[in-house]
Amino acid sequence: MIISAASDYRAAAQRILPPFLFHYIDGGAYSEHTLRRNVEDLSEVALRQRVLKNMSDLSLETKLFNETLSMPVALAPVGLCGMYARRGEVQAAAAADARGIPFTLSTVSVCPIEEVAPTIKRPMWFQLYVLRDRGFMRNALERAKAAGCSTLVFTVDMPTPGARYRDAHSGMSGANAAMRRYWQAVTHPQWAWDVGVNGRPHDLGNISAYLGKPTGLEDYIGWLANNFDPSISWKDLEWIREFWDGPMVIKGILDPEDARDAVRFGADGIVVSNHGGRQLDGVLSSARALPAIADAVKGDIAILADSGIRNGLDVVRMIALGADSVLLGRAYLYALATHGQAGVANLLNLIEKEMKVAMTLTGAKTISEISKDSLVQELSRIPSGLAPLAQGTAA
């Protein structure tokens, strides 16, 4: 299959992966309205084309949390990444490291902190949930710090799991799920050999290290279901600060008031995110939520954004809407599933090229020059409360 755009990786991944894994990452909550709007709203953001601006010295480099990034992109935390390619977290981290951008390790990764961190030169980021087992949280923070992780990404939009109906149909959960997953695995030989046979162990490395015993997929589902904590509050940030003194980013912000609270409670950054449409269906897309949040806290805190970003043009759109940088999730996982580290490296090359084209044709020589002035306001009235966007078809 010819890979000429990031979207090609999705089609390739669907052929390679067992359905339970493809639909786990591809799907969203409930009827998946927010999942679709994440992509559609962002695709409808119209950029303002400018010409004859002498763009010969264009630069994508930026700084974030005292780190220099080759472009304003980081790889988002993705659970079970190591089930999509052999030791997937290690491969994805290597691709990000070579590109000069951060990789974020998920709490529920297959490869533990201690396996991934020594393989890269750049300090990785670590993502943490608020869980009932505070002993695990403290253990994870201490291990992340000991491994040299530079930034903590604290996910706050999962006090309870979202209702992901696709999982019951695909075999991730539901009746006879284990048997269905087994049959899917043996009928997808490329994945079965690369990951099923050679990608072991398949446990959740960070959790296994804490519990002192292997953990499989069933353990993953059960452990998370029993440990999400609906009592989460802003005071939990104060507790985390007892064990973490580096940059802390709050992931899962969709409302300006929550963004202001993040500033008040001393966070260093926020991620404008609806968890890729996987938690509460019907909430605003990140593209629609971002401008009002930027108006509220831009300059007071670093603003990152995710959900719906599929290519370099989308990165430029998010920055024009108010983000300082973005996180890539599904896009890089499709590439990882298709060609491993090389796939992620190629995806990042594609994104860089697409960003350069977009910046060249909008007259922005640097990341700091991408702003709301880069948008055609008549078509880009994204903030909640303004006129709806013109209808279009998502790319």
Swiss-Prot record:
Coiled-coil regions listed: none
Listed GO CC annotations: plasma membrane
Gene3D superfamilies: Aldolase class I
Cited CDD domains: alpha_hydroxyacid_oxid_FMN
Reactions this protein catalyses: (S)-lactate + A = pyruvate + AH2
EC annotation from Swiss-Prot or TrEMBL: 1.1.-.-
Cellular location(s): Cell inner membrane
EC class: oxidoreductase
Binding-site residues, FMN: 106, 127, 155, 251, 306-330
Xref: Pfam families: FMN_dh (PF01070)
GO terms for biological process, alphabetical: aerobic respiration; lactate metabolic process
Membrane topology: Peripheral membrane protein
Necessary cofactors: FMN
Residues binding substrate, per UniProt: 24, 129, 164, 278
Active site: 275 (proton acceptor)
MF term (GO), any: FMN binding
Alphabetical UniProt keywords: Cell inner membrane, Cell membrane, Flavoprotein, FMN, Membrane, Oxidoreductase
Domain called FMN hydroxy acid dehydrogenase: residue spans: 1-380
Role this protein plays: Catalyzes the conversion of L-lactate to pyruvate. Is coupled to the respiratory chain.
Record-stated family: Belongs to the FMN-dependent alpha-hydroxy acid dehydrogenase family.
Annotated protein name in UniProt: L-lactate dehydrogenase
Underlying gene: lldD
